[in-house]
Amino acid sequence: MLTVMGGPNVVRGGSHSGNVSASDLARHGLLDILSSDYVPGSLLSAVVRLVDDEILDLPHAVSTVSHHAAKATGLHDRGQIAVGLRADLIQVRLVDLPNGKRHGVVKSVWREGIRVL
């Protein structure tokens, strides 16, 4: 069984409905996947937040929105950087915000190994 939580839960600092915090689950090694059906941009923000708050290291935080999610949905040709896989990648620049936090800005996108942005 996998634990799937919403990216907005991490970004907001907790559940909007009073349920368990995704960050708390991650802190205890209980978060497998981050997803979002209504704020897809929250996935990148959640990865940055988990790393900046020292809850997960970068590879583990990225895996919650890539490898683990792809594996759980049967998309075995993507989700990690490895020979023979799709090579869907993003390049991100971290921007310092006035409140002391950081925000990820997508600089480049590759789809199936071809740069599209």
Predicted regions and their residues:
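C-terminal cap of metal-dependent C-N hydrolases
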Residues: 67, 71, 83-117
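Active-site-adjacent C-terminal substructures of enzyme catalytic domains
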Residues: 1-80, 96
